[in-house]
């Protein structure tokens, strides 16, 4: 339909840069690999950054022409959080977090510890968080302390595996505590973006995998 309606595309962009991504995999001790995207057409392919793809999607499909854009996910190539100023046709990146510091990786590691599949079943943990009215304080404090003092959540389950030796930390207590820590960090981020000197309108577009955490989006 698109080809019939608009004709042949002038450019085709891929949503991330696999070569930059490979450098991060080398850094993390993972085996780098690259498989070119397969297209049925002979178009010249251009790569863009993962977070720029998120930001562009959020802004250019929105009703705003002057706004801040916040992107948070587990990880792009290296970036895990980016903040952008969008005005007119332009997107300008203001600041970022880079791997291994990642709010999304923290949530995924805790999802795995609680017994669900990381990078897929975080929505189940988000729902399970509602079972308790308040987080179990020792677990909440342990997660928050880890976030404040050690950003190596890329180690995944091994990050929190030692908790199994501690009787005060049970997997069933993790969802509510993890959600509470996530929301605390998220509120701080939103406050910083809202108060940024370039936020002229008060608008914020939030995109990326963490935007699916609808419980936190009420802020």
Predicted regions and their residues:
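Short beta-strand-loop/turn "lid" adjacent to the catalytic site in phosphate-handling enzymes
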Residues: 2-44, 56-57
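Active-site metal-binding loops of divalent metal-dependent hydrolases
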Residues: 17, 74, 208-210
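Short acidic-aromatic active-site loops that bind/stabilize oxyanions
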Residues: 45-48, 168-184
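Conserved phosphate-binding catalytic cores of ATP/NTP-utilizing and phosphoryl-transfer enzymes
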Residues: 47-70
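Active-site pocket-lining segments that scaffold enzyme catalytic pockets across diverse folds
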Residues: 58-59, 66, 188-192, 210, ...
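A short helix-loop
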Residues: 68-172, 218-219
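Phosphate/ATP-binding catalytic cores across multiple sugar-kinase/actin-like superfamilies
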Residues: 176-201
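Glycine-rich phosphate-binding loops at beta-strand->alpha-helix junctions
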Residues: 203-217
